[in-house]
Each structure stands twice: as C-alpha cells, then as structure tokens.
Design a protein with these regions (language model features):
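Generic beta-strand/beta-sheet core signal
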Residues: 307-310, 352-354, 379
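Metal-dependent active-site segment of extracytoplasmic phospho-/sulfohydrolases and closely related
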Residues: 333, 340-365
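Histidine-centered active-site microenvironments of extracellular/periplasmic hydrolases
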Residues: 357-388
Length: 456
C-alpha cells in the first residue's frame, strides 16, 4: 500500500473518525449505574431515520376525497400537491405523495402511518395553546424540538436520550447496542455504554494509507504509544480520554473484522446535492452491520440504529425540493427493506421516521414556516400495517377561521399523539419493558390515556 505523510490536520481528522459519543468519558468516570431488565435470546433492531429540518408531512399524506382535498388546497394554496398525483391508501381517505413503494407497502400491510404526532407534555387544546398553558418549551426551534424528540421528554431538559435510557435497562447491554451511522445525536447520548458512531466507512488502521508496508511498526502501534503517555498521566480526564481512545481502536478493529463477512448490498438511490452522508450509504451500512450482528463482540441481541436525512427546512423552493426528497426517501426505504427481507429478518427489524416538527399549513411564499404536529412512517414485518393510527385534524376554514380545535390561529397543527406514545410503542416491542421501566424512559407517558398505540 502506498504510504503518505500525516500532517496535524490528518491526525485530527483520524482522531475524530475514531471518536465515540462524548458520553463515553462520563461512562469511564462512573457517572452512571447499570439497571437490569429481561435478557433476550432472539434478535430485534430499531432503525430510526431522522428527517432533519422539519418534514412537511401534510404534503406527504394528503386527503383524497373531494371535500377533504378542496379544504386542504384552500389552506395550502400554491404549495399544495396535485390531487391526480396522490397514491391512494387502502381503506382510508388519504393518499401518499411521490412515494409509490411506501404506498405498496401500506397496501400490503407492511407499513403504518402515525398521524399528527409531536412533542407534548400532556394533551392540550387550542385555547390552552394560545394561552401558553402546558406548551413544550421553545416550540418551533430546531435544536430544542430535535432534543425533545430525541430525549422523549418535552417537560424538562434531559441528560441522556431515550435510546440510551432504553439500552441501560437491558441486562445484555452491549457495546454495539446503540449505533449511529451519521455521527453524534442526542437520542443515543448519555448511556452506560456510549453509542458506537460511524461517519462513512469503517476502516482498519492499515487501510488509512498511513502505514509503511516495509515498516516493522504499524500506524496503530505508533498511535498506541502516543496514547500510552496520556494513560500514564495523573490527570483523571486525560486518563479517561486515553482509555476511551484505546477502547475506540479496539472497537474499530473488532467491527472491521466482522465487516469482512458482511453481506454485500448495492443501494443505488441518489439525490442531487444531498447534504451530509447520503442516506442510501447510511442504510446500506446498517444493513451490513445487521448482517454480521452475531459476529460483533458480545453478539448483541438488541440494537438501535440512527440514520439521518438532512435538508427538510423548506422555507423556500418547497414545491421543487420536497417532492424529490420524498421520492428519494421512498426509494431508499424500499432498498433497505429489500435488504432486510433478503436476510429473513423482516419480523425482527422495524424502521421508523421522526423529524424536528411538521410545517405550518399556511405557506410563506414558496415555502413553509416551522410547525408542530406531523406524520411518521413505520415499516417492517412486525408492524400492523395498512392502517393510519392517531387522528388527522380537520383542514377546514369557515369565514377565515380554522374549525379544528387542533389548528392554531397561525396555521400550525397541535399534535393529537405525543412523541412519547409513539416511541414507547416501539420500545415496548423492542425491549418488553415493564410499565415502571417505560416511565423511566418516557417520563410523561402517564399523562396520556393510550400508552401503546398498537401498531406493532
């Protein structure tokens, strides 16, 4: 292999590629105490696809009846999607836009839609919202709403995400229970074991191009020597950081060895100017990791994966960009589900979407403002598909006033289902948690009558 000189920038980039979640330092310092729950012999995985920026779900799932569509078009105006392009969903009055594979999955009972879900402390009415009663803090803020979705708590700031807390409650908690293929995220932050984070491909050190094939000392040995000096430091944080880096090296080597036996998939979906790591590449990596889950250290029986599709903050050019993103998401989800099915793991792997928030129903030019409630997709063999769960608000206007008690004066939609209800339903399938354990993961769940939505 051709060797090359490593400069300071290269070294820092490599260090970043090795990094696990920063919660690993806290874990090494003993910040958390383990909790125990049931042990499992079967395998299950949850795959979260976070639609970052705020997906306009009311242009993803649209009424198809004459009256329903006319009301929708009256509110949405120039950003409404054409009725003749809607793909009907069986036994409903709604259709999907630009997502033919998802329509096919829904009609084959392999995909469910969760209607009007969002961050809530408890159920609230429009009157309460307008009066500022029981509203989640910092509504319509990207970073705050993302964090509330990822912590599953809209009442107070959390120190860890819901996936980290869910993993803590597993008896067979594993170093590879939580895996992100798009870098750091709060959903998997703060657990007793840090999330394993990947940005791009996994390489053993001798594949980075920095080792000299004629040298007796490999690059990873040199890096070990550098870190060893930090291990011998008297400073507790320096020692913890060094231990973390050594652990990361071992993790990378273990995963890269397992990946030598991974099944090959060929995800071909593309999206022009897609920011960040392409979702197709992320989900292809997840499929490969799932194919070798039994070969990872500890053979994890439960895994939560995090992927992210960027670019949903459509303040402009929504009618051009949003349909492309929906179709791309449709294609990649189909490719991923085909890969899972080919491994005969459809019943064991459940994929679901989440987003910062929905968008305002009323356009602001050629785009939309930040909203609140939106719709989510859940697919997999264990899903009770072919149904819409939850409640759609009525999209009717009389004399300039919205008649639905869930549409605010500014045209935003108050969620009728909480993110905690949605995520708790997924978690119940994933971990068979007791009611008391679900309360640890989802602190506001008892504020809602329906704790399990029954879609899985």
């Amino acid at each position: 292999m051709k060797s090359k000189t490593m400069n300071r920038r290269d070294f820092l980039k490599l260090q970043a590629s090795l990094a696990l979640s920063s919660s690993s330092l806290l874990s090494l310092l003993g910040a958390f105490s383990p909790l125990q729950a049931a042990s499992f012999s079967d395998y299950k995985a949850l795959v979260c696809i976070f639609l970052e920026g705020g997906n306009d779900a009311f242009n993803m799932v649209v009424p198809t009846t004459t009256t329903g569509y006319d009301d929708y078009k009256l509110i949405r105006g120039d950003i409404s999607v054409p009725k003749d392009e809607l793909l009907p969903l069986k036994n409903t009055d709604y259709g999907l836009y630009n997502m033919p594979a998802m329509q096919e999955m829904f009609n084959a009972d392999k995909l469910a839609i969760i209607a009007n879900v969002g961050t809530l402390v408890r159920p609230i009415t429009k009157i309460e919202f307008e009066a500022g009663i029981a509203n989640p803090p910092q509504l319509f803020s990207h970073i705050d709403q993302q964090k509330q979705w990822m912590s599953a708590n809209s009442n107070r700031l959390e120190k860890s995400g819901w996936a980290a807390k869910a993993a803590n409650l597993l008896e067979n908690l594993n170093d590879f229970t939580n895996i992100s293929v798009d870098g750091s995220n709060f959903m998997q932050f703060g657990g007793d074991k840090p999330a394993f984070e990947i940005s791009g491909d996994i390489h053993p050190f001798n594949n980075y191009g920095y080792s000299d094939p004629d040298s007796k000392i490999s690059f990873d040995e040199i890096l070990h020597q550098i870190i060893q000096r930090e291990v011998e430091s008297d400073h507790i944080l320096i020692k913890a950081y060094a231990d973390n880096q050594i652990q990361n090296i071992a993790y990378r080597e273990s995963v890269s060895q397992a990946m030598e036996n991974a099944l090959e998939f060929n995800f071909t979906s593309t999206l022009d100017d897609e920011p960040g790591i392409p979702l197709a590449k992320q989900l292809e990596m997840i499929a490969k990791l799932i194919s070798v889950h039994a070969q990872l250290p500890g053979s994890p029986k439960r895994q939560i994966f995090f992927a992210r599709l960027h670019g949903f903050d459509h303040h402009d050019l929504q009618t051009i960009d949003h349909p492309l993103k929906l179709n791309y998401l449709n294609n990649v989800l189909q490719e991923f589900q085909d890969a899972i099915t080919s491994m005969q793991l459809s019943d064991q792997v459940t994929t679901f979407t989440a987003s910062d928030f929905g968008r305002s129903l009323v356009p602001n030019g050629n785009g939309t403002d930040h909203g609140w409630g939106g719709h989510a997709l859940v697919m997999g063999g264990a899903v009770k598909g072919g149904q819409i769960y939850g409640e759609f608000p009525e999209l009717t206007v009389v004399s300039g006033e919205y008649t639905s008690e869930y549409i605010t004066n500014s045209g935003r939609v108050i969620p009728t289902t909480s993110a905690e209800q949605y995520l708790a339903t997924l978690a119940s399938w994933f971990g068979s948690y007791s009611d008391s354990e679900l309360e640890i993961i989802f602190p506001n769940l008892n504020n809602f009558n329906e704790k399990n939505l029954g879609f899985i």
